[in-house]
Amino acid sequence: FVSGCRNHCPGCFNPETWDFDYGEPFTDETEEELIKALRPSWIQGLSILGGDPMEPENQSALLPLLRRVREELPGKDVWLYTGYRLESVSSSPLLDLADVVVDGPFIETEKDISLAFRGSRNQRIIDLRGEGQWKTQ
């Protein structure tokens, strides 16, 4: 989880992460722990949520981590969860390092616990490595 989110979605499952100062600082030691935890073959990849990884303050810390994941662990997938629509963050360099984005704000009136990988029906699962097609499930 990253800390810091300006969306403040009503009904958010993790509102404590809205605060940019919540939690522990991301250090070189934290990065080493993450890389080590991702190495086993039974670990498919890394999911980054929060807070919101697309907040500018979070992107600067995540870029080096995701570059390292791509270089050292090329078979692992990377999922980013953001309350922003993909169209509004499409220039983010994080997208070049991600495989899948789950986008859109959580909308409590569209909450559906039967959905895979997302909390409300308005959110999309977008396969960035597929043939340019967005998939929603």
Short names for language-model regions:
Residues 56-62, 67-70, 111-137:
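P-loop/Walker A phosphate-binding loop and immediately adjacent motor/lid segment at beta-alpha junctions
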Residues 47, 99-102:
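Residues embedded in well-ordered beta-strands within globular domains across many folds
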Residues 8, 42-44, 74, 97:
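Short loop/turn motifs at secondary-structure junctions
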Residues 51, 83-85, 106:
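Active-site beta-loop-alpha junctions enriched in small/polar residues
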Residues 1-28:
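Canonical Radical SAM [4Fe-4S] cluster-binding loop centered on the CxxxCxxC motif
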Residues 19-33, 55-95, 100:
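Canonical radical SAM enzyme core domain
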Residues 33-53:
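Short Fe-S-cluster ligation motifs
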